[in-house]
């Protein structure tokens, strides 16, 4: 049983993997992590899934409970690696808003933006379908309405439950074939290289990635603004304003990431599968650097 945020949920998945395969040191994980093929597509390793089941009770909104993957930091390389198996998904996920009143507000709101990032990049994906769009639009509607309510009244349990349902819908859309993009890819590197909490990585990166991608998916971005209650407005401006309304950081400077680290972040990002699913093609570190400079 795991009770807590997304990192704890993923830790539970990794513990189950260790129990199944007798992993007891860092080198033991190498055979089980996913790798990129020459086309930039993630290829999971083949292995027996864990026989020990997991019950997850999330207290944040990062939505890692609902998928078959787990992210784990490799402290040897400062890279965040992905592990995937259908049996890594928790057998039961319990959404109870009551315990979440004890979650620090910055964690609740920033992981809410993480869920909004899932829905936004999924809705803007070139792989989006009618099924995924249905989930993502409803996720954006719920999250954009409920997160400010919780900020105003931390004990508003109905609003907290709406946030949790929005979180679930924000990841359910991936079952319809949509993929994430550069906000997720760069965010993974910000976490691995600089230790930025992944809720904050979405706060900082998502608006700038939307602006970078506008030439490739302006029509899809209009759906984001519409779902958030701002039809006809620029999606990046809507998302940035929403993050500002919640009192969350919007620049790399605000999360203590300086230009001296940009090259390492960009290099790490080139090994992330989501970069190659970004709507605007990104093939070199300089493409990542362009977004980092905009977010500085």
State where each predicted segment sits.
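Buried hydrophobic positions in well-ordered alpha/beta secondary-structure cores of metabolic enzymes
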Residues: 6, 58, 96, 116, ...
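Gly/Ser/Thr-rich loops at beta-strand to alpha-helix junctions
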Residues: 5-9, 61-63
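A glycine/threonine-rich phosphate-anchoring loop and its flanking beta-alpha core
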Residues: 21-130
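Short Gly/Thr/Asp-enriched flexible loops that form oxyanion-binding sites at enzyme active sites
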Residues: 8-22, 67-68
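C-terminal charged capping/lid subdomain of soluble metabolic enzymes
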Residues: 225, 229-296
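Short alpha-helical scaffolding segments that buttress acidic/His motifs in well-ordered protein cores
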Residues: 116-120, 163-171, 206, 239, ...
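Active-site segments that bind and position negatively charged phosphate/pyrophosphate groups
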Residues: 122-238
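Periplasmic-binding protein-like
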Residues: 1-3
